[in-house]
Amino acid sequence: EAKRKEDESIDLIVTSIPFSNHYEYTPSYNDFGHTDNNRHFWAQMDFLTPELLRILRPGRLACIHVKDRILFGNVTGAGVPTVSPFHAEGIFHYLSHGFDYMGMVTVVTDVVRENNQTYRLGWSEQCKDGTKMGVGSPEYVLLFRKPQTDRTRGYADVPVEKDKTNYTRARWQIDAHAFWRSSGDRLLSAKELEGYGPDEMGQRFRDLSRSAIYNYAQHVAIGESLERKGKLPGTFMAIAPGSHAEDVWDDVVRMRTLNTDQVQKGREAHVCPLPFDIVDRLINRYSNKGELVYDPFAGLMTVPYRAILLGRRGGGSELSEDYFKDGLRYLD
């Protein structure tokens, strides 16, 4: 479908590409998930990526959501879980096809929930031998730019402009700075946190950890105190630290996806839905109102759906007939 599109007809690409052969999204031979390994997957992407470069306007961005893959020791023969650096492979793949690499946004994930899915970060195993333990696997948004026509100037052929009355100098200086200054406010104590439910507890702890000077020992002490009182959940991380860096997003709401509506309506849930938060931020930052935002792996049409709500036009391609039909219902 990308091959059918006109040259330079897309203003922004936002997509979550298949994670190699980690998932099989549809029972179709054409599914990108039906590949032997990473090398085979990227060989298939070699057919799509040049088309994405062709249809994108000069100077505009392709925002690629990816996640590293966990490799299990009993499969690889390593004996311990290791990590396949899928995001790094993605960087070099898109560079090889002519995109300029603009950087990477890190989206923090919950290590407790991750362990419940992969069993590679278990507390008991950590206590037996810490050397076999890595860290949680965040998600990444890789930012690639199609070179602008005039390489002597940095501007896109059609810039994404901001109105200075709404987007002030002060706001930009804060946005552009890598870290936020501390107000000196202290963290809440475990006793103060006990009165909140798990959801509100997590939000308050994250907000306060952004504004106060971080204290690792105090963070651990709060968690231990909550655990002694039976207040520390074992299925998700209730007191995750907040991020000061603009390129590390700690507040993505995992429940805000079209899968929530799918489940409520008794329809098939997507195996890997994009949260609204990620999509909205990318659309607002990298496109103008009225422009066309495209997702070549549209799934439930999250990207075109959010684009329309944000005053843009949306387009997407999807192999699964069921996902496609459900996506049309959201767009209707």
Each language-model region and where it sits:
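Core catalytic lobe of class I
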Residues: 1-326
